[in-house]
């Protein structure tokens, strides 16, 4: 009886909050609503609420039918949930779009001419707000781009699905009295006279050819989802961001990236929409399509006060850390929050004394996501202006604050530590590196390879056996990948993931990298002007040491894998923990490298998979993987991944 009562209570509560949400008066956060939803799903997976669309309607507007029902989406709140869904799907590559946090709308066209705009409503029938939409930015009244000879030449007839968005900059300038951009957009789009609708923007994310009652009929100017998105842009629509991912791990990595840059966007997003490139009409007709999913940003948030900024030093970089009034988040007391870089401080207009929204999604240090308000007594944030070690003036590029002196002892010491870490030289600890650096014996990566067993043995508390072990560990990592080689030089912003993106773009050789220009790098995904300049500048400075390591025979860069079969794990990283059943751990690690992947000795941010035969254990690696959202798979799943089962 208790279970049935709880189900009824949840149904009632969810219906109430759905109505409030879709009519611009939410009383609880998205995270709180998702928790209710997930609890009901666990108790009653076939509950009718999962197969109906909540009502969104306003009196005073004419009603109109959708060309195709505007259903709800399956949801994944974390990487394991997304992976569980993805493994059930018949496709292994994904189209990933921003899930914009606004109000859904269908724009209807007849032979290229805009005829009406219909709100979500109950998913089948919504409010006709055509007059209001005519005042919004981003509306295309006449679609002049035709299908072309490959599909026929008739102008488009069908529905364009959009999100009505209020930009954050507009909200801050004109509508601060509204709780957030979504509430403001929902309120304005349903004003009877369309007043102030010029402050709203339309972003297109989907299209369906046909007419009311006859979806997917007639000529379509696209055959796949990717062609559809290209066509929408050609037609002139503002479109949501899109990324094409070739693996589950790449989707998870991209989600982490978007969560990091989310505060700097001028619009609100609350997740990603994942789908296949193949258009499936029958699936799209469902109230809850099975072959697409909303991969949500799992957050817990609270409002608190920014008390002070502490500047954390790592290598040459100075990173702002917010010291905040203690607040409870995810069962812990939070006193510090990450701000990533100076640009975030500027974008959010943060001051000492600001009331801020702090979120936690598993990281050790939570993040400041938004400004709640700036009270009258706030103070400007002060930035350090000189290096604490060498005294050089710091450079502030917005995305980073750093010491530009390439001879700064702190930078050199950090680079040597990074080299040892990236190459995973396990017996060469940071204490030994520090002692060698302080002795003046090691001042570059090259110096590491001139060390002798006798020199190492002479160091206090070392001894010959330990010295031989360290020497062997260092020289056993002679043949390494280009990714490891470049990432090991600790160039700001150029970690293993970014080097892999360079390789994917065709930079498979050290000489190609050394000879490339800023413009060449700027064409690579996620490489903007600043990062491209940083890379070219550092490669120029480090060129002699890089080529020297190779010319002297200390390091050999492995040639890139050429066949798709051989590089099946390219771009993926693995960490193994616990006992394996079919092979030794060293054999599994060798398999990963043979297939183009990389191996990590510990769970770190950006790791693709933790492989363990006890995924439910409370081990430190399992806990860390869960905190970082890293996919945890069994040995059997790993073997499936590399085609060994």
UniProtKB/Swiss-Prot annotation:
Which residues constitute the signal peptide according to the record?
A: none
| Cofactor(s) the record lists | Mg(2+); Mn(2+)
Q: Which PROSITE patterns match?
A: BRCT, DNA_LIGASE_N1
Molecular function as annotated in GO: DNA ligase (NAD+) activity; metal ion binding
Q: Where is the active site?
A: 99 (n6-amp-lysine intermediate)
Similarity comment text for this entry = Belongs to the NAD-dependent DNA ligase family. LigA subfamily.
Top EC category: ligase
Protein name from the UniProt record? DNA ligase
């Amino acid at each position: 009886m208790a279970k049935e009562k709880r189900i009824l209570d949840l149904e009632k509560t969810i219906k109430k909050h759905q109505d409030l949400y879709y009519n611009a008066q939410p009383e609880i956060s998205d995270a709180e609503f998702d928790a209710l939803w997930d609890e009901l799903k666990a108790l009653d997976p076939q509950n009718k609420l999962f197969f109906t669309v909540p009502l969104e309607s306003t009196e005073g507007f004419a009603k109109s039918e959708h060309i195709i029902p505007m259903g709800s989406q399956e949801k994944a709140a974390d990487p394991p949930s997304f992976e569980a869904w993805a493994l059930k799907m018949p496709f292994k590559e994904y189209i990933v779009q921003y899930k914009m946090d606004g109000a859904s709308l269908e724009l209807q066209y007849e032979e290229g001419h805009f005829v009406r705009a219909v709100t979500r409503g109950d998913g089948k029938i919504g409010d006709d707000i055509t007059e209001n939409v005519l005042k919004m930015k981003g509306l295309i009244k006449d679609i002049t781009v035709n299908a072309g000879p490959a599909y026929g030449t008739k102008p488009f007839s069908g529905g364009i699905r959009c999100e009505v968005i209020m930009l954050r900059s507009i909200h801050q300038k004109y509508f601060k009295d509204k709780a957030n951009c979504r509430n403001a957009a929902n309120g304005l789009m349903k004003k009877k006279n369309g007043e102030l609708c010029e402050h709203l923007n339309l972003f297109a994310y989907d299209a369906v050819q046909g007419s009311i009652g006859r979806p997917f009929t007639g000529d379509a100017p696209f055959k796949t989802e990717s062609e559809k998105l290209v066509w929408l842009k050609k037609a002139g629509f503002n479109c949501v961001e899109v990324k094409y991912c070739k693996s589950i791990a790449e989707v998870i990595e991209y989600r982490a990236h978007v969560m990091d840059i989310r505060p700097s966007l001028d619009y609100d997003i609350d997740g990603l929409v994942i789908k296949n490139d193949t258009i499936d009409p029958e699936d799209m007709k469902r109230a809850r399509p099975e072959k697409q999913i909303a991969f949500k940003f799992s957050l817990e948030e609270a409002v608190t006060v920014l008390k002070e900024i502490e500047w954390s030093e790592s290598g040459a970089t100075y990173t702002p850390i917010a010291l905040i009034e203690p607040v409870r988040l995810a069962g812990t007391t939070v006193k510090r929050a990450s701000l990533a870089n100076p640009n975030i401080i500027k974008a959010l207009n943060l001051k000492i004394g600001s009331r801020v929204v702090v979120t936690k999604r598993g990281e050790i240090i939570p993040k400041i996501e938004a400004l709640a308000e700036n009270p009258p007594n706030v103070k400007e944030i002060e930035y350090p202006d000189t290096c604490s070690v060498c005294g050089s003036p710091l450079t502030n590029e917005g995305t980073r604050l750093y010491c530009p002196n390439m001879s700064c002892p702190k930078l050199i010491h950090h680079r040597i530590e990074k080299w040892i870490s990236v190459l995973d030289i396990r017996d060469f600890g940071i204490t030994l590196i520090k002692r060698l650096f302080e002795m003046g014996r090691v001042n570059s990566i090259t110096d590491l390879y001139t060390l002798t067993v006798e020199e190492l043995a002479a160091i206090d508390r070392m001894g010959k056996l330990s010295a031989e072990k360290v020497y062997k560990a260092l020289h056993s990592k002679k043949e390494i990948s280009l990714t490891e080689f470049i990432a090991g030089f600790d160039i700001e912003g150029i970690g293993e993931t970014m080097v892999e993106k360079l390789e994917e773009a065709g930079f498979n050789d050290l000489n190609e990298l050394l000879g490339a220009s800023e413009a060449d790098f700027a064409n690579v995904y996620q490489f903007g002007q600043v990062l491209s300049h940083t890379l070219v500048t550092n490669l120029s400075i480090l060129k002699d040491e890089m080529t020297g390591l190779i010319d002297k025979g200390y390091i050999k860069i492995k040639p890139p894998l050429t066949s798709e079969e051989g590089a099946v794990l390219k771009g993926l990283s693995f960490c193994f923990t616990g006992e394996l059943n079919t092979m030794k751990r060293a054999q599994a690690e060798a398999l990963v490298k043979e297939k183009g992947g990389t191996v990590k000795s510990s769970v770190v941010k950006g790791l693709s998979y933790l492989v363990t035969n006890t995924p439910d254990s409370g081990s430190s690696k399992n806990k860390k993987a869960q905190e970082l959202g890293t996919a945890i798979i069994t040995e059997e799943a790993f073997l499936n991944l590399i085609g060994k089962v």
